[in-house]
């Protein structure tokens, strides 16, 4: 990636074979990806005053640095007990970590004369999370099944368990602002307007800025899914066939969000 200036790593492994005179089959698979990347973009909002003059009312510059790590592991087995009975098992586990740092400089509430408020914001996390905002998603799915034949009666069944979680620990936003700033607006390129600070104004964070807000959020989502099904079929003496079965499903989902906003007792010491 040309912004992160780091290479992407991709690894994969697959192995399969049969054992015990082909009665037991096995397939194993694993993959790993580490992708550091980033982006830079500018966003603008245009307005028109009563005199028909068009001007930029909101001016944003955003830079993102993200490291995405993906891990996936899976296994599948089938076992032929004998010609009338067979068991199968499948399992998969996925883990995705996103570490993100975002830096945003925003000129808000610009008027047609180029006067507005500068906001500088960072989105990050704690030292335990590489000082970045961590989003961790995990999924797992396991299924056990079988096929059986007892004379004229056949049966197949399947039991499965799936779980998905998402964690966003210590997601922090730090926002500073500086009011009454003046800018010279070059609108010759409508797709890329250029704001140049006037005399005494700035886009660079300094001790002139005041704290706008400091917030922290914890978010946890968990979803579980359990299923069991069984199907039977029987051949009757008159040549007819009887089929019946049952299925049970249980699903749960929980979401918990804790939000905190902090105000320093001594803002001068905090700055």
Regions found by a protein language model. Name each.
Residues 22-26, 83-87, 151-157, 238-242:
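Outer-envelope beta-barrel architecture signal
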């Amino acid at each position: 990636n040309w912004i992160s200036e780091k290479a992407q790593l991709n690894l994969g492994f697959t192995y399969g074979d049969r054992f015990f005179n082909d009665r037991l089959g096995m397939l194993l698979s694993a993959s790993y990806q580490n992708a550091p990347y980033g982006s830079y973009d500018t966003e603008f909002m245009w307005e028109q005053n009563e005199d028909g003059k068009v001007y930029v009312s909101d001016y944003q510059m955003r830079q993102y640095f993200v490291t995405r790590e993906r891990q996936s592991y899976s296994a599948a087995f089938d076992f032929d007990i004998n010609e009338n009975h067979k068991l199968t098992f499948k399992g998969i586990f996925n883990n995705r970590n996103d570490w993100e740092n975002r830096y945003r400089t925003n000129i808000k509430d610009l008027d047609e004369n180029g006067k507005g408020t500068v906001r500088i914001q960072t989105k990050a996390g704690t030292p335990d999370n590489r000082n970045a905002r961590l989003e961790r998603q995990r999924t797992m799915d396991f299924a056990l099944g079988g096929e059986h034949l007892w004379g004229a009666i056949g049966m197949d069944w399947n039991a499965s368990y799936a779980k998905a979680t998402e964690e966003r620990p210590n997601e922090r936003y730090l926002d500073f602002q500086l009011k009454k700033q003046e800018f010279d607006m070059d609108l010759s390129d409508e797709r890329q307007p250029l704001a140049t600070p006037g005399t005494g104004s700035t886009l660079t964070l300094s001790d002139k800025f005041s704290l706008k807000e400091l917030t922290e959020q914890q978010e946890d989502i968990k979803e579980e899914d359990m299923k069991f099904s069984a199907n039977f079929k029987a051949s009757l003496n008159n040549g007819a066939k009887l089929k019946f079965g049952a299925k049970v499903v249980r699903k749960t989902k929980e979401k918990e969000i804790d939000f905190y906003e902090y105000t320093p007792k001594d803002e001068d010491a905090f700055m």
